[in-house]
Amino acid sequence: MDWEGPGSADALSAAPARVPETQWEAAVGVLLAAVETAEPVVLACHVSPDGDALGAALACGLALRAAGGQPLVSFSPPMRLPAALSFLAGQDLLMAEDALPRRPTVAAVFDTGSVDRLGALAWLAEAARDVLVVDHHATSTRFGTINLVDPAAASTTMLTAELIDRLGVPWTADIATDLYTGLVTDTGSFKYQATSPAAHVLAARLLAAGVQHAHIARRLWDTHAFGYLHLLGDALSRARLEGPDALVWTWVDRSDLERAGLDVEEVEPIIDVVRTAEEAEVAVVCKQDADGSWRVSTRSKGRVDVGSACQRLGGGGHRLAAGFTSWTGPEETVGRFRAELAALASEAGMSE
C-alpha cells in the first residue's frame, strides 16, 4: 500500500532530522581525524548509566575500533554495570576515570544533558579540545563544541546509529546489540510515546544485523534475583496515592536493599510497576543510594510535564520520564516535587 501523511517516506526514515548538517559533518570530521592520528577518543556517559547511555557509548566505541581508532569508554565511579546490562558488547573498552588521558583531543559524551551529570568525569568538558555531545533530552544544555542533540529521537542510540553510518562503519552483531539495547530501554520496549516510525525502522535494521532480541528482552526485564521479589512486595505495600495531581509514590531505603542483597541499580524497574496504577497520572519512586542520597525516578502518563519539575530540582530528562537526586527523605522529597508540579501548572494557567 502507499503511505501518506505521518507514514510518508520522510517520516519513516530512520535518520533523525533535527540535527543541523554542519554538526554532523563536524562530528564525523573530528572523530575520523582522531582515528587517522591514532589519538585516543574518550567516550563518556552519565552517572549510573542505563541501557541507552551505555549502549550508545559502547556501540560508538566498537565502531571507532573497527575503523582503526583507540576508543576509551568510561563513566563516573563506581564503574559497575548493572546485572541486567552485563550482556552488552565492548566491555573490554571500559576504562576507569583515573586512567583516562587528562587532555584528550576528543571526548564524546552520550545521553548526558548537562556537565554535572558526568559526575567525576565533568572535567572532560573543559579538558578536551573537542567535546561531542550526543543526546536526545529536551533539557539538554548543549554543552559541547559539537552537539548532536535531537529531542525527537526516541533514544540516544538512534543518533549514535546515524553517526556510525556516517563514519562508514558496517554494523556488526555486537554494534547492533548495543544500539538495540538503548532503543528498547528508552522506548520501554516500544510502549512509550517517544516510539516513532523511525524507531521501528531502526529496530528492523538492527534485527537484520543479528540482534538476539528475545535474549535482550529476557535480560532487561524478565530476570531478577529472588530477593527482588520480596523487595518489590515491600515497596508496593507502602505505595501511596495522593493529591489532586493523582500522584502514586513509594520508596526503597538502604535496609530494603541490604536485606534483599541488591544494588540500587537493580530496583530501577519498580517505577514501571508503580506507574501502572490506573488512578495515577504521575508516579515517583525514591531509592536510597549508599551515600545516603535518594535517586528519584518520575513518570507521567501524558498530561503532566515531570521533566520540567525535575529540572527545577537539579535533575532533568524527558517530559514524561525524568529524575533528580535528593538529600531529604522520601516524604519531603515528594512534597518538593509536587510543589514544583503545582508551580508549573500555575504558571501555565497564568500564561493562557
PLM features: residue spans?
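Short alpha-helices
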Residues: 134-202
